[in-house]
A protein has these predicted regions:
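Conserved internal helical-beta-strand scaffold that buttresses enzyme catalytic cores
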Residues: 1-168, 172-187, 198-199
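Short, surface-exposed alpha-helical segments at coil->helix boundaries
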Residues: 188-192
Length: 199
C-alpha cells in the first residue's frame, strides 16, 4: 500500500489529476480503507447491504433492528469499488476511482483502461491530456502470467484510439496461484516476463 500511495502522490506532483484503479479481491479492503480513505462504517454497512441507509443510520435514532435485519443483501465485500476526491495540503486536487470487480481475475483490466481512455478523451484528447489520467492495475503473479485478458489488454496499448500512454502495473508476487507453485504456473522465470513483449 505504501508503494501505491507513493505512485499516486508522485504522479500528481507531475500533473496527473485522475487515477483509475483495478485490482483483484486480495488487498481490496486495505486499498478501500487506506488508499481511497473510504469510511470504515460505510465499508461495513455495504457488507450487510445496509449502505443505502448508512447515512440515515448515523443520523437517526429511530432506525430499528428489524429494518436492518430485512434490508437488501450486500455484494461480496471483495467486489466493492469506490470513488473519491482528495486535496493535498499544497492545494493539489486529485480524483481516485477503484472500479468494482467481480470474482473473475483480471477481467477488470480492459474496463480500467477503457475508463481511463474515456477520461483522457473528455479532458481534451490532446497528447498532453494523456498525462492527466493514470490507469493503475494490481495483479497476482499467477493471474498476470496465466490470464489471457492481461495479454489482450496489453496488446491494445499502442493501437490508436486505445493508447492511454502507459499503465502502472503492480504485481503482488506471493508465489502461489491458489494451490499452484510458480514452476507449474508458467514457462518463464518471472511472472512479469509477459510485459517484455510490449517494451
Amino acid at each position: 500500500m505504501p508503494a501505491l500511495k507513493d505512485a499516486i502522490d508522485r504522479a500528481s506532483e507531475l500533473g496527473a489529476h485522475s487515477f483509475v484503479m483495478g485490482m483483484p479481491h486480495r488487498g481490496r479492503l486495505n486499498v478501500l480503507g487506506n488508499v481511497m480513505r473510504k469510511p470504515m462504517p460505510l465499508i461495513f454497512s455495504e457488507f450487510s447491504g445496509t449502505n443505502y441507509k448508512a447515512e440515515d443510520n448515523q443520523k437517526s435514532k429511530n432506525f430499528d433492528d428489524d429494518n436492518k435485519k430485512w434490508s437488501i443483501s450486500g455484494d461480496v465485500k471483495y467486489h466493492l469499488g469506490s470513488s473519491m476526491d482528495r486535496t493535498y495540503p499544497d492545494g493539489r486536487k486529485i480524483h481516485l476511482s477503484l472500479v468494482a470487480n467481480p470474482s473473475h481475475l483480471e477481467c477488470i483490466n480492459p474496463v480500467v483502461v477503457g475508463k481511463a481512455r474515456a477520461k483522457q478523451y473528455y479532458c481534451g484528447n490532446r497528447p498532453e491530456d494523456v498525462r492527466n489520467v493514470v490507469p493503475i492495475l494490481l495483479h497476482g503473479d499467477s493471474a498476470f502470467a496465466g490470464q489471457g485478458v492481461v495479454y489482450e489488454t496489453m496488446q491494445m496499448s499502442k493501437v490508436p484510439d486505445f493508447d492511454v500512454g502507459g499503465t502502472i502495473h503492480v504485481i503482488v508476487n506471493n508465489q502461489i496461484g491458489f494451490t499452484t507453485n510458480p514452476i507449474h504456473a508458467r514457462s518463464t522465470p518471472y511472472c512479469s516476463d509477459l510485459g517484455k513483449a510490449f517494451n
